Amino acid sequence: MLNIEKVKITTLSENSVADIDYIAEWGLSIHISIEGHQPILFDTGYRHACIYNARVAGIRLSEIDKIVLSHGHADHTGGLRSVLEVIKYENPNRKHIDIICHPAAIESQHVKHTDHYFYRGCPYYIDELTRLGARFKISSEPTWITEDILSSGEVPMKTDFESVAPICYLKKGNQYVNSTVEDDQALFILTNKGLIIILGCAHRGIINTVLYAREITKIEDVYMVIG
């Protein structure tokens, strides 16, 4: 387990800021730095805030080892292209960066308002991102990022008081199919003080996610839940 003092978590994009030097936007991006390991980026925000804020904070995105996507909605994947471009610019010799996500994260995701469907998935073609060095590692199962960091994969729906908003849909062919946001996942960091659980939107429920974290890590103590 990691010593908690070796873990540094920096929010690079969120819908509010605590300092006028930074900018806010819809969505989320979190930089995770652990002593002795290359950093990890959890989500990329909606547009460019994570890039701007990383520069203000003195964080070099080219040092990121992997990008983990909490799910496919645009406010978490919209910064992908810009992040990959910055990595390529800062380190032209780098060939690939792994992007870890659920299979549904790259499907055609929509939301329904009144009688209309609006696209809310990743705003880029997968081929477009792979040309910039993205190497997709796609799985619905838990995936070890390091020996102490685990992506949850698909979170089981166990509680009877948490549910997915009925406005989420996947477009399959010409049909819109109701989605339970199966791609929603979290990061679990195993530390000497307990689990740090990093959420995206937690579409499948915060409590469901915490219960699953305890189940697959066999650690009962939860030190922190953020996201």
Regions found by a protein language model. Give the residues of each.
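Active-site environment of divalent metal-dependent phosphoester hydrolases
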Residues: 49, 74-77, 106-108, 143-144, ...
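Pre-active-site segment of Zn-dependent metallo-hydrolases
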Residues: 22-23, 35-66, 81-82, 88-90, ...
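Short acidic low-complexity segments
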Residues: 60, 136-145
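Active-site HxH/HxHxD metal-binding segment of metal-dependent hydrolases
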Residues: 65-140, 153-164
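Active-site metal-binding loops of divalent metal-dependent hydrolases
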Residues: 14-15, 44-47, 72, 103-105, ...
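Conserved beta-strand hairpin/beta-sheet module of binuclear metal-dependent hydrolase folds
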Residues: 6-57, 180-199
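Cap/insert and terminal regions of metallo-dependent hydrolase folds
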Residues: 66, 73-79, 97-98, 177-186, ...
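Active-site-proximal loop/helix segment associated with metal-binding centers of metalloenzymes
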Residues: 113-119, 141-192
